[in-house]
């Protein structure tokens, strides 16, 4: 008799994705972050659903409804902080996942990589509209500043901004539509995740050696299910330490002040996971230039498969590109720090140098290093 999981139409899909999936036997813990992102997405959707049951998307009551969730709803404080800090964990896993993809040459699976970039952009959009919902000072002014950037688009800019706002400023209509977007986008992300997995399972995973692993594969279950479970336990442990001991460490104190259009906070800045992009945005002295730099800071990831000329897969045996990679990571951390600093000397200058280096490493230095390493191989 045939095994049900191999014949049943629904179970067959799960079986081919999580049980009998042929997996390289040498993939390291850096490959755990895909499953951790799946767990983060599930946590965010579940906590978000319970928050939406008590939240009101109206400027008069939004701030009070969040306070009500924390004070009066059973375990409301836990759900709220799980959702807020879950977003931070989501982005930590995302950045590591992308970093792993760059280091081990996963971008050569171009369909999977491109869907991944779409996923990154959609997740960033979701987090941005979500940050507006508590209707604190930073929510309001963050929404005002970032949506206002669209006015830099020639000819249609001003009309576009007013259309997104639903009026002449960030107000009731803006909050309502942002709530609608924040509710629907995670389900769109889930659909993209399935496409991401579909493309990945067409080619199979890469592995740390960068060599073809077709001759040496093992089933995903039980080895990798247990390995992923360990990752999940560690992720939940870090998340719970954040939520129960340091719930506000990654937030902004200004967001505990209700939104006031007449009073601007001293330093308007987004959540920590957007600071690198915010620093790049602020580095260009021209408004439109800044907006383009902001968009390109993510879209530049799409150039990796195009600019790669290396004979080797991944950076394991490529010392020059490896050095550039770690300089790139350090530079990203500098940009994150600069994004949270006031706009004054020397921060502006450091930000401009770091922004230029961010693009230079990806578009100029890494392709040159590829060619040098190819020449060294011929010696």
Curated annotation (Swiss-Prot):
Record bears the keyword RNA-binding: no
One BP term from GO: mitochondrial electron transport, ubiquinol to cytochrome c
Residues the entry annotates as binding heme b b562: 83, 182
Domain of life from the UniProt record: Eukaryota
Regions that span the bilayer: 33-53, 77-98, 113-133, 178-198, 226-246, 288-308, 320-340, 347-367
Species per Swiss-Prot/TrEMBL record: Abrothrix jelskii
Co-factor: note: Binds 2 heme b groups non-covalently.
Membrane disposition: Multi-pass membrane protein
Function description: Component of the ubiquinol-cytochrome c reductase complex (complex III or cytochrome b-c1 complex) that is part of the mitochondrial respiratory chain. The b-c1 complex mediates electron transfer from ubiquinol to cytochrome c. Contributes to the generation of a proton gradient across the mitochondrial membrane that is then used for ATP synthesis.
Subcellular location, record wording: Mitochondrion inner membrane
Matches recorded under PROSITE patterns: CYTB_CTER, CYTB_NTER
The keyword Transferase belongs to this UniProt entry's keyword annotation: no
Obligatory cofactor(s): heme b
Misc remark: Heme 1 (or BL or b562) is low-potential and absorbs at about 562 nm, and heme 2 (or BH or b566) is high-potential and absorbs at about 566 nm.
UniProt-recorded name of the protein: Cytochrome b
CC per GO annotation: mitochondrial inner membrane; respiratory chain complex III
Alphabetized UniProt keyword annotations: Electron transport, Heme, Iron, Membrane, Metal-binding, Mitochondrion, Mitochondrion inner membrane, Respiratory chain, Transmembrane, Transmembrane helix, Transport, Ubiquinone
Source lineage: Eukaryota, Metazoa, Chordata, Craniata, Vertebrata
Record: residues binding heme b b566: 97, 196
Gene Ontology MF annotations: metal ion binding; ubiquinol-cytochrome-c reductase activity
Family: Belongs to the cytochrome b family.
Residues given in the record as a ubiquinone binding sites: 201
Consequence of substituting residue 118 to I: In strain: Isolate MVZ 173083 and Isolate MVZ 173084
Assembly and binders: The cytochrome bc1 complex contains 11 subunits: 3 respiratory subunits (MT-CYB, CYC1 and UQCRFS1), 2 core proteins (UQCRC1 and UQCRC2) and 6 low-molecular weight proteins (UQCRH/QCR6, UQCRB/QCR7, UQCRQ/QCR8, UQCR10/QCR9, UQCR11/QCR10 and a cleavage product of UQCRFS1). This cytochrome bc1 complex then forms a dimer.
